[in-house]
Curated annotation (Swiss-Prot):
Residues that hold mRNA according to the record: 78-83, 110, 128-129, 178-183, 223-227
Function: Component of the protein complex eIF4F, which is involved in the recognition of the mRNA cap, ATP-dependent unwinding of 5'-terminal secondary structure and recruitment of mRNA to the ribosome. Recognizes and binds the 7-methylguanosine-containing mRNA cap during an early step in the initiation of protein synthesis and facilitates ribosome binding by inducing the unwinding of the mRNAs secondary structures. Key component of recessive resistance to potyviruses.
GO CC terms: cytoplasm; cytoplasmic stress granule; cytosol; nucleolus; nucleus; P-body
Record InterPro entries: TIF_eIF4e-like, TIF_eIF_4E, TIF_eIF_4E_CS
Disruption phenotype: Delayed bolting. Increased resistance to potyviruses such as clover yellow vein virus (ClYVV) and turnip mosaic virus (TuMV).
SUPFAM superfamilies reported for this sequence: eIF4e-like
Gene (UniProt): EIF4E1
Name by which UniProt lists this protein: Eukaryotic translation initiation factor 4E-1
Region EIF4G-binding, residue ranges: 60-63, 70-106, 154-163
Organism: Arabidopsis thaliana (Mouse-ear cress)
Post-translational modification: According to the redox status, the Cys-133-Cys-171 disulfide bridge may have a role in regulating protein function by affecting its ability to bind capped mRNA.
Quaternary assembly: EIF4F is a multi-subunit complex, the composition of which varies with external and internal environmental conditions. It is composed of at least EIF4A, EIF4E and EIF4G. EIF4E is also known to interact with other partners. In higher plants two isoforms of EIF4F have been identified, named isoform EIF4F and isoform EIF(iso)4F. Isoform EIF4F has subunits p220 and p26, whereas isoform EIF(iso)4F has subunits p82 and p28. Interacts directly with EXA1. (Microbial infection) Interacts with viral genome-linked protein (VPg); this interaction is possible in susceptible hosts but impaired in resistant plants.
Length: 235
């Protein structure tokens, strides 16, 4: 697990890694009875694995490594160019590393107004200028503060658990802390691939049980038109 300079506004002061023994499994089937941070376990087959015998927890690699990024509003307000205050925080590549980080980070409802918190595939920077993001766009959902933490967690689990049929199209996700509502967006690579984008939008809504219509805005349109950019697709 790679650890960068860690903004104190993201990570709690006393971060203690938690030992997680089971992989992410069918998180969205657990319903509201599952505690935040709980990982679903499968039925045992009665066998004792070698990692249990040795006393060393088994590691469960993810298909991709992911990096958390943070844009600090206190620093951002003093910068002249967009993105100059954006910093990588941690990179993780296993289920155990993810939960250790997530359980010791501040969740969206506790972040300062104006903050932006990202989780992107490793080596992809959460910027329009990144060559992998340049031709893409984003789906966006809005949530009241009391629902933002769970929605952010379920979005992260869907990403790192490779739940999307067109997961290769996904760059990452961001939660924007704004006023009474939070925005969560999923960034994708190729905006012209309509079938893939619409599939991602529909599946995301299913995973989060989100009933409102959502829109997909192409990055190029957002750069040119800002808030006047129109949805290219809806789901």
């Amino acid at each position: 697990m790679a650890v960068e300079d860690t903004p104190k506004s993201v990570v709690t002061e006393e971060a203690k890694p938690n030992s997680i023994e089971n992989p992410i499994d069918r998180y969205h089937e657990e319903g509201d009875d599952a505690e935040e941070g709980e990982i679903a376990g499968g039925e045992g087959d009665g066998n004792v694995d070698e990692s249990s015998k040795s006393g060393v927890p088994e590691s469960h690699p993810l298909e991709h490594s992911w990096t958390f990024w943070f844009d600090n509003p206190a620093v951002k307000s003093k910068q002249t160019s967009w993105g100059s205050s954006l910093r990588p925080v941690f990179t993780f590549s296993t289920v155990e590393e993810f939960w250790s980080l997530y359980n010791n980070m501040k969740h969206p409802s506790k972040l300062a107004h104006g903050a932006d918190f990202y989780c992107f595939k490793h080596i992809i920077e959460p910027k329009w200028e990144d060559p992998i993001c340049a031709n893409g766009g984003k789906w966006t959902m809005t949530f009241p503060k009391e629902k933002s933490d769970k929605s952010w967690l379920y979005t992260l689990l869907a990403l790192i658990g490779e739940q999307f049929d067109h997961g290769d199209e996904i760059c990452g996700a961001v939660v924007n802390i704004r006023g009474k509502q939070e925005r969560i967006s999923i960034w994708t690579k190729n905006a012209s691939n309509e079938a893939a984008q619409v599939s991602i939008g529909k599946q995301w809504k299913e995973f989060l049980d989100y009933n409102n219509s959502i829109g997909f805005i192409i990055h190029e349109d957002a750069k040119k038109l800002d808030r006047n950019a129109k949805n290219a697709y809806t789901a």
